[in-house]
């Protein structure tokens, strides 16, 4: 189900301030901020200053762009999904569907864009120990990868339940030389891994850099992570011009914390002719307690250092999230997504576990691409979206990751034994 503001609440495009920098105290409207222990304030200030200096330094941006090309494998292609397009074609036409192939990056997902950028920042700040949280394991693998590349010590915090679901990625991280620390608190998933990583950072802030994996957390992380992922949308904008001579009509991406979606959306936010659609995890259904549809069903609150929309009970306590996808299994969302929803610039929908599985199977069978379960949520929304779109509409979906890591989960759900 789509969650949008009433027509009267649609924003004046001239009032949008997507230029990348948030307002005072790291705010996107009322969202964002720095709700952290005093111990971390100097580290956050250092990170913000170092990032600003780095982006202004041609040596830094030159090295980053060189590694994005030669190590990560960018630019990723914009692929015309001809059979998926044909599947949704109607007698009166229908949209043309394109995939931004972030699954073709080194390590198999978009996460490497941010991990690489932050590792270079850590080197610039003289930090030799890296920590990170991970849910599906893709951010953990990306972080372990860049730590191996630059000779940095690496500790990845991962919920015990996610370690069970993503055993392949756990092995990959360890093979890359990282220590994977299981977290058994709470639901033993991404929220709990993030909390444990923050505790580590508070204790070891002088020597350690925390490579936060999404556009969440205290300022400057939502801005920092978004800026490292904005290469996705920057490439897509140029590729759309080359492929069909104009901007796309619709951009769509899955949303957990929201980094892949923000990376795609951000370069288009001021292009108000382009619809931005984020797809969340409805789990067993948004009418049940077992879902992760934070924007669709959440209320404003504070989690992991920032104010954003959260899943909460009637007492304001953060609720446990559920999704078949470990990467979307999070009760919060990046504050800029909350802001884009509140001002009406972006739309957000939610699809169930079963719908996501159907989307994964459809794309696998029609395009020969096995997407990650996270990405499959965006594909699943095509079922509701496409009948509403006119002939000639150009739709770009961020194929944020490949599905190798999810084969065991999918097989289990489909009743197959490996």
Swiss-Prot record:
What Enzyme Commission number does this protein have? 4.2.1.20
Region ranges (Disordered): 1-28
- Residue numbers of N6-(pyridoxal phosphate)lysine PTMs: 111
For bias type Polar residues, the affected ranges are: 1-18
Subunit note:
Tetramer of two alpha and two beta chains.
List, alphabetically, the SUPFAM superfamilies matched: Tryptophan synthase beta subunit-like PLP-dependent enzymes
Q: Which family does it belong to?
A: Belongs to the TrpB family.
Alphabetic keyword roster: Amino-acid biosynthesis, Aromatic amino acid biosynthesis, Lyase, Pyridoxal phosphate, Tryptophan biosynthesis
| Known role | The beta subunit is responsible for the synthesis of L-tryptophan from indole and L-serine.
Q: Which cofactor does it need?
A: pyridoxal 5'-phosphate
Q: Which Pfam families match?
A: PALP (PF00291)
Q: What is this protein called?
A: Tryptophan synthase beta chain
Pathway assignment: Amino-acid biosynthesis; L-tryptophan biosynthesis; L-tryptophan from chorismate: step 5/5
Domain of life, source organism: Bacteria
List GO terms (cellular component aspect).
cytoplasm
Q: Which reaction does it catalyse?
A: (1S,2R)-1-C-(indol-3-yl)glycerol 3-phosphate + L-serine = D-glyceraldehyde 3-phosphate + L-tryptophan + H2O
What GO molecular function annotations does the UniProt record carry, in alphabetical order?
tryptophan synthase activity
């Amino acid at each position: 189900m789509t969650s949008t503001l009433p027509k009267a609440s649609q924003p004046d495009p001239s009032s949008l301030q997507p230029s990348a920098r948030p307002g005072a105290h790291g705010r996107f409207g009322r969202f964002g901020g720095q709700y952290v222990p005093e111990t971390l304030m100097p580290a956050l200030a250092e990170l913000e200053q170092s990032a600003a200096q780095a982006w202004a330094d041609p040596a830094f941006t030159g090295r980053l762009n060189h590694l994005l090309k030669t190590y990560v494998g960018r630019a990723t292609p914009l692929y015309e999904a001809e059979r998926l397009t044909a599947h949704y074609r109607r007698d009166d036409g229908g949209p043309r569907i394109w995939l931004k192939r972030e699954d073709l990056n080194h390590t198999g997902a978009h996460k490497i864009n941010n991990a690489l950028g932050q590792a270079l920042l850590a080197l610039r700040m003289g930090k030799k120990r890296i920590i990170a949280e991970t849910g599906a394991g893709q951010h953990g693998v990306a972080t372990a990868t860049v730590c191996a590349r630059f000779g940095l010590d690496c500790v990845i915090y991962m919920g015990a339940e996610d370690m069970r679901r993503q055993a392949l990625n756990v092995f990959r991280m360890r093979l890359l030389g990282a220590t994977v620390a299981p977290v058994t608190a709470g639901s033993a998933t991404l929220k709990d891994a993030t909390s444990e990583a923050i505790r580590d950072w508070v204790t070891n802030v002088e020597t350690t850099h925390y490579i936060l994996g999404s556009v969440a957390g205290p300022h400057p992380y939502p801005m920092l992570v978004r800026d490292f992922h904005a290469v996705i949308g920057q490439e897509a904008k140029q590729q759309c011009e080359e492929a069909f001579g104009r901007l796309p009509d619709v951009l769509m991406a899955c949303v957990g914390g929201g980094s892949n979606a923000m990376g795609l959306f951000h370069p288009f936010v001021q292009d108000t002719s382009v619809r931005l659609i984020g797809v969340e995890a409805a789990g067993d259904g948004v009418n049940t307690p077992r879902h992760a549809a934070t924007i669709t069903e959440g209320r404003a609150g504070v989690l992991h250092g920032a104010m954003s929309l959260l899943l909460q009970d009637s007492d304001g306590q953060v609720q446990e999230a559920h999704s078949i996808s470990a990467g979307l299994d999070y009760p919060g969302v990046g504050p800029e997504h909350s802001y884009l929803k509140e001002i009406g610039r972006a739309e957000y929908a939610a699809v169930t576990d079963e719908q996501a599985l159907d989307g994964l199977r459809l794309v696998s069978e029609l395009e020969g691409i096995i997407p990650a379960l996270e990405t499959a949520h965006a594909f699943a929304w095509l079922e509701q979206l496409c009948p509403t779109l006119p002939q000639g509409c150009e739709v770009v979906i961020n194929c944020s990751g490949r599905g190798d890591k999810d084969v065991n989960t999918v097989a289990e759900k489909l009743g197959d034994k490996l």
